[in-house]
Every structure is written in C-alpha cells, then in structure tokens.
C-alpha cells in the first residue's frame, strides 16, 4: 500500500513540475507577444509620423552619433564632449568653436516636402550661435539654398531661414532660449507655411512663399561654416517627413523620440529606448 502511495505522490509531484514548466513557457510566450506588439505599435506610429532620422545622443563615447532609425549617422568634428546629463539620458556638449559640430551626409530624404525638425538644446548666452545648418561646407555660402537653417540671434532668440526660388523667408522668435536652461525647438513646414515652436508652443509663423528650394548639402548640427557655433548641450534631434501636429509635437517633447525609434537589442527581443532612458529636468 505504501509503495502505491509513494508512486502516486511521485507522479503527482512530476505532474506539478510539468504544469509549472508549462505555465512558465506560456508566460514567456505571452510576454514576448506583448513586447512584439509594443514594438510593432511603435513602428507603426513612427511610420505614421514619418520619422526619418533620430539622433538620441546616447552613444557615450566615440566619434559617431548614431541615427537609430535609418543609419544616417553623424560624424563628430572637433572637440565635442559626451556627457550624461542630457534631457533624456546622454547628450553632447558643444564648446562654441566653429570646428566642433556633428556632420550628417546628404540624403534626399532631408529634402522632404513637408518636414519637421526637432531638437532639445541647453545653450549659454553667447554671440550668435547655430542649431542646424544645411547649405554647404564653406563660407561664404556659394548659393542661397537654406532648406534647413536655425540659428540663435545675438540677443539669444531663435531665427529660422529658408529659400524659395532663391528668395529668403525668415521667422524671428520671441522667446529667449540661450539662457542656460533646456528648451525644445521645432520647425514645422507643411508645404505652405513654416511654424516655429519653442517648448511646445508657437513662437512664430509665416507663409513659406512656395515650395522650399532643395539642397544636396550635408547637415551641420551645432555650427555653420565661418566660425559660428553653439555653446551648450544638444539632445534628441529628429527629422520627420511629415508636418507634425501640435499634439504630436508636444507628445514627442514630453516623452522623447525613443518611443518612435525601436531598436534591436543584441541577441534579445525587440525593445524600445523608452524603457531604457531616464529623463533629466
């Protein structure tokens, strides 16, 4: 009788182990499916917004700023310094020298019509600075094709410039942003109008005057030729092939580009940078 009871107990224990293993496997499958659904959702959202490039500035070393969306990596020129006190995770510190900037090679995607450009900056007050430049590697510029051009006036407010059939368009902002604090700056071009957003609010707008002239120039982040450069930190720079709505822009400003730029972790299931980054105030 004892033998039969022992055998029965042993079988019961084995059955419990089998059930436990099965439950664990089911949990892993469900968790993997949830992660995959999140990743696919982020991919779909990113595709909807037309996110073409996202430079998150989390590389923490080296001479390359990775574009986690499409591989338009930026090359670090001069003496930029990696820091860990960005708006979201890491950042690059720019010393205000014209030879120190991030250079991204030309791609036709950057001639998109419409488009949106976004960036977090923490700039010190200085005499004339540059956020982004796209009109060649020399100064004076050989031709007026400022398809993407954002600079900081000597009085510390932002200025947008562009060209249509060689004619210049311009918006002068109202908000001081070179004040040692983090500010989110965005240019939204919908094919007819250009809007300047600072910290999620419209700071200036104007008709574009037509379709913006296109360029085959690289992107310079943090400087332009002729020794005009930024002094401060840059983080979360992104380029979209769509004109973002105000709500979409504010969501990106508040939550970062991470959720729109899923990446493949080495040897692991797809995850998103949104789960890995820390927001700094």
Model-derived regions, located:
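Extracellular glycan-interaction patches encoded by glycine-rich segments
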Residues: 93-94, 105-106, 163, 174, ...
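N-terminal secretory signal peptides that target proteins for export/translocation
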Residues: 1-28
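Short strand-turn-strand beta-turns centered on an Asx-Gly dipeptide
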Residues: 197-204
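Extracellular glycan-recognition modules
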Residues: 48-52, 60-65, 97-159, 168, ...
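Extracytoplasmic low-complexity segments
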Residues: 34-98, 250-281
